[in-house]
C-alpha cells in the first residue's frame, strides 16, 4: 500500500487517502510524506484528546507531515467553552467546523451518497470552504 500511495503521489498533484477512525494507518506508516494531515473529530473532549494523540503519534514515528489541521464534524451550535479551551491548547490549526446537517443523516439513512447534497446545504458549503482553504495552503 505504501508503494502504491508513493507512486500515485509521483503521478498526481493531489492524492486523498481516507482512513478509518483511529491511529492504525499512521502507526503502520502507510504514508511517508503528507502535505496536509486532516484530523477529523466529533465535538467532544474525548475526540479532541484523540486528535491530539494522532498528531503526536505522527510526530513520534517521524511521518513527514508538512501541515496538520483539525476539522470538527457534526457540530451543533456554539462550541462549549471547555471544548474551545481544549482546542486552543492543541498544536493544531482549527481548519473547519462542519455543522450538523439533517440532510447528511437523511442521505446516510437511505444509503445514498453525500454527492447528492445540494449546494445550499450548510455542511456542503463548509466543506467547500475547507477545500478552498486546503488548496490555498498546500
PLM feature segments, named:
Residues 4, 86, 117, 130-133:
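Residues that form generic nucleotide/phosphate-binding pockets
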Amino acid at each position: 500500500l505504501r508503494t502504491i500511495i508513493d507512486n500515485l503521489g509521483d503521478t498526481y498533484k493531489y492524492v486523498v487517502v481516507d482512513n478509518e477512525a483511529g491511529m492504525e494507518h499512521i502507526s503502520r506508516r502507510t504514508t511517508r510524506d503528507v502535505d496536509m494531515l486532516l484530523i477529523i473529530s466529533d465535538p467532544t473532549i474525548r475526540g479532541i484528546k484523540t486528535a491530539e494523540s494522532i498528531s503526536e503519534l505522527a510526530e513520534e514515528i517521524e511521518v513527514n507531515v508538512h501541515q496538520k489541521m483539525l476539522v470538527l464534524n457534526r457540530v451543533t451550535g456554539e462550541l462549549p467553552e471547555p471544548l474551545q479551551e481544549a482546542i486552543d491548547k492543541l498544536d493544531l490549526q482549527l481548519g473547519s467546523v462542519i455543522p450538523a446537517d439533517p440532510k447528511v443523516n437523511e442521505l446516510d439513512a437511505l444509503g445514498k451518497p453525500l454527492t447528492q447534497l445540494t449546494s445550499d446545504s450548510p455542511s456542503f458549503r463548509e466543506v467547500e470552504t475547507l477545500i478552498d482553504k486546503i488548496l490555498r495552503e498546500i
